[in-house]
A protein has these predicted regions:
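Structural preference for solvent-exposed beta-strand-turn elements
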Residues: 1-369
Length: 369
């Protein structure tokens, strides 16, 4: 194999494909990246048997071929190379020479024939939508994905297609996030759960322009095609929470608040909260203000924030991080807050429509909180 390309072209491919490479594996080949040069195209693949990423770019190919190079070392070498054209050549004994400027490296490659093939996705039912929309749907829900492996189904986001509606849902037992979007050309109703780790990689790959991302799920795997990059990952089996039943239908109180002002107040009160001192924040709604306070072993904090509407003497506790993550994800200038009582969840939603819904369960307050 022999090809050349600009350093940035090669580095971009490596930065994407290497995200699917495991650090340690009983199969040494899985610690490597598969490089395949053919015609005027270089394809680099990373795979950990659960998620695979294959990404392609045009390069100057002199001799086609396929090899596997250790991902960590190869990526580190390319990052340190000068900004110039990179020349890569492999001889018949798999000795690979990498040249760039005055830098020269010789690495022993592995045979590519034993590198496992990415999972096949047997589906002709695809969904297409602009990359920024999928990116925002992931960003506005992924923080609610559970990290508790005892219930694997909730370590991913549920994608639910009903009619022309796409809903992305995440839940971790303490909060629930739903992001809704109207899409065109949907293949029919379906549900599937995509691992949170895979969605975080997809979010990194997605661009901010209006290019299309194509999504093809089957019964076991799902394929995301994003320009010259393809990501394939296993789906998670199991029974996802009936999230509609979890969202209250009736509330005693409904007010609105300036989202940024609310965030800033909570951030200030949270300054005395840490990983070791995780006391909840006490929210005291009284009149048209919410008074926030917190007590930990290192001190006390207090602030207050106005809102539109009126609530008489409601006191409720929340985990500061859960509330902040929901408010930051919302994005709107004004948000609607709906509450029922001190032991009921709070709902954060837009002033109009139902583009997103965030449910946060309260924390039972103690006298010294």
């Amino acid at each position: 194999m022999k090809f050349s390309c600009e350093k940035e072209t090669l580095l971009n491919l490596l930065n994407i494909a290497s995200r699917a490479v495991t650090g340690k594996s009983s199969m040494p080949l899985l610690e490597g990246l598969l490089l395949a040069a053919d015609a005027d195209t270089l394809t680099i693949t990373g795979y950990d048997l659960s998620m695979g990423i294959r990404t392609t770019a045009q390069v100057d190919v002199v001799e086609p071929g396929r090899i596997v190079l250790n991902s960590r070392l190869f990526c580190e070498i390319v990052r340190k190379l000068p900004q110039d054209v990179v020349y890569l050549e492999t001889d018949d004994k798999l000795m690979t020479t990498i040249k760039c400027g005055r830098s020269v490296f010789n690495l022993m490659a592995s045979e590519a024939d034993e590198y496992p093939a990415l999972a096949d996705v047997a589906s002709d039912k695809g969904l297409s939508l602009p990359q920024p929309i999928l990116k925002s749907m992931i960003a506005q829900t992924i923080f609610s994905v559970s990290d508790n492996e005892s219930k694997p189904i909730h370590t991913g986001c549920q994608f639910e297609i009903e009619g022309s509606r796409l809903n992305v849902v995440a839940v971790d037992g303490y909060r629930l996030s739903v992001r809704r979007e109207t899409v065109e050309g949907v293949p029919g109703d379906m549900k599937f759960v995509v691992p949170g780790a895979s969605l975080r990689e997809i979010e990194r790959i997605l661009g901010d322009d209006d290019d299309i991302v194509e999504i093809f799920p089957d019964s076991k795997n799902i394929l995301f095609r994003i320009g010259g990059t393809t990501l394939i990952t296993r789906l998670i089996d199991g029974e996802f929470l009936n999230y509609r039943a979890a969202i209250p239908k009736e509330f005693e109180h409904e007010v609105s608040a300036d989202r940024q002002e609310l965030i800033q107040c909570i951030e200030r009160v949270s300054l005395i909260v840490s990983e070791k001192l995780k006391n909840p924040i006490r929210f005291h709604f009284d009149g048209s203000y919410v008074q926030m306070s917190c007590v930990t072993a290192i001190g006390k904090s207090y602030d207050e924030c106005p809102f539109d509407g009126s609530i008489e003497n409601l006191e409720i506790g929340f985990n500061n991080r859960y509330i902040l993550e929901a408010l930051r994800a919302a994005g709107d200038e004004q948000v609607k807050l709906q509450l029922k009582g001190a032991l009921n969840p709070m709902i954060i939603s837009p002033m109009e429509g139902d583009k997103y819904t965030y449910l946060v369960l309260p924390v039972r307050l103690k006298a010294n909180d």
